[in-house]
């Protein structure tokens, strides 16, 4: 248990270091309007993560879904989505049948910005270190959770 605690401390440190080094993405990938929009506020930055998660899981998202997972207020989420929509980073899907349910998905510029972000992560040695520590921690916790054969 002590080893996993020490490893967890190292993981927390590495993750904090990685999270504070987002400048790597900014430096390695030229200026882009999408990145600027989503990095201008904490709300927009966090919502982008949820938008992309829903996009890769099911192809689209609604404002209600973003409100539920983000715990931001509906007006805040709605404002951010509509601003991204006006700037052309999101598009509204048509043909859902229910006028109350509005589905959105990222446009190609936003998807390209996300791919650039992911490429920057993979090029960042700190990200690789954090990922390896996380994998080691998960394996150790799985082993610790398994009942010992000697307890019979």
Outline where the language-model segments fall.
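Short amphipathic alpha-helical elements of helix-turn-helix/winged-helix folds
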Residues: 50-54
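Short coil turns linking two alpha-helices in DNA-binding domains
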Residues: 72-73
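Basic amphipathic alpha-helical segments that dock to polyanions
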Residues: 66, 77-88
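Amphipathic alpha-helical dimerization/coiled-coil segments
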Residues: 115-152
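Short acidic, hydrophobic short linear motifs in intrinsically disordered regions
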Residues: 57-68
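N-terminal leader segment of winged-helix/HTH proteins
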Residues: 1-38
């Amino acid at each position: 248990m002590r080893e996993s605690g020490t490893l967890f401390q190292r993981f927390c440190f590495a993750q904090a270091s990685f999270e504070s080094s987002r400048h790597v993405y900014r430096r390695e990938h030229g200026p882009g309007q999408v990145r600027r929009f989503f990095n201008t506020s904490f709300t927009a930055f966090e919502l982008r993560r949820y938008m992309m998660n829903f996009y890769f899981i099911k192809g689209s998202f609604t404002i209600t879904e973003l409100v539920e997972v983000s715990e931001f207020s509906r007006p805040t989420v709605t404002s951010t989505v509509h601003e991204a929509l006006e700037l052309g980073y999101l598009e509204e899907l048509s043909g859902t049948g229910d006028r109350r349910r509005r589905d959105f998905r990222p446009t190609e510029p936003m998807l390209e910005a996300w791919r650039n972000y992911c490429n920057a992560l993979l090029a960042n040695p700190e990200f690789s270190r954090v990922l390896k520590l996380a994998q080691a921690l998960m394996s150790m916790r799985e082993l610790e959770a398994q009942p010992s054969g000697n307890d019979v």
